Amino acid sequence: SRGLGDVYKRQGMKYYGRLSVIALLAIAPLYGFAQEKVVPIKYGDMDQWIIRKVHESGVIGGNTKLLYEIGPTKEIDGNKPYKNMGGSPWGTSNVMAKVVGIVKTNNSVYRDKRDNGYCARLETHIESVKVLGMVNITVLAAGSIYLGDMLEPITGTKNAEKNMNWGVPFTQRPKAVRYDYKVKMSGEKDRIRLTGFSKKGQVAGQDCAITVFFLQKRMEDAEGNITAKRVGTMVVKYDKDSDGWVNGATYEVLYGDITKHPSYNHETMGLRERDYTRNSKGESVLIKETGWAEVNENPTHMIPVSYTHLTL
């Protein structure tokens, strides 16, 4: 098992993180006794990677950039929109964009060595593209991995999150999420806001890495709108340095209405209405969480996400 985030800051505004093996922990009866059962997520050991060679437009330098995707070992050369390969359920914040004819990339998740294999290094950095009279954007890009996929290329500067398809079908009820992680914080007491559409600002409060795991019971109406009840919730924030790698960290999944639970935090664990998925018609629609499921309900989808930057 390998693990989640090594997050620190350098060169003004950069954060880094590492992540690898993620598994779900279930309790299965065995000869009348409860027995732990660890169920790995496909490619969740982070030992296999697809490396994409994307050639950016000459007007912004014409550089060849490497984009890393979690999936079967493979190299892809050319500006080809990426679709998940080999049955990989993993999406990343690495994307190819083509805005007003200009090809630009963002890579904030990297393949990184750990022991005899690999892990994922998640980085938050400032990404900028400027072409006189055409485009002028500077934005803080967080490193993230999630279960789902991204529709490429990104073609506009607004509502890019609609290209993301959050979550994958899942009907089990895991007891916990387990992985290894390593954390080193920036030490800065405040965050920055840099959206690409306004001046650089400051946000009170320390930055942190965060992992969320949501189980949802989704429903689609005749018009293709999707609502969901929250079945299970697990959220953990990392705001302190770890003492090297922490192996086998295990976090309990809470079921049903957790608003009275001592660990409940509305900002990070509350019902959401900002994630997108594709409906049965192939349209990108907002997932509207309308309430908490009963404590014994089964989900239809799961959404694990890890970020190197707190985005609420």
Spell out what each predicted region is.
Residues 2-11, 308-312:
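Conserved small/polar residues in nucleotide/adenosyl-binding loops
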Residues 9-40:
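Bacterial Sec-dependent N-terminal signal peptides
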Residues 188-196, 206-213:
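Beta-strand acidic-aromatic groove motif in beta-rich domains, primarily in extracellular
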Residues 199-201:
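Extended catalytic cores and adjacent scaffolds of nucleotide/polyanion-binding enzymes
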Residues 180-186:
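Solvent-exposed strand-to-loop "edge" motifs in beta-rich extracellular domains
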Residues 17, 21, 25, 299-307, ...:
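Intrinsically disordered, low-complexity repeat segments enriched in small/polar residues
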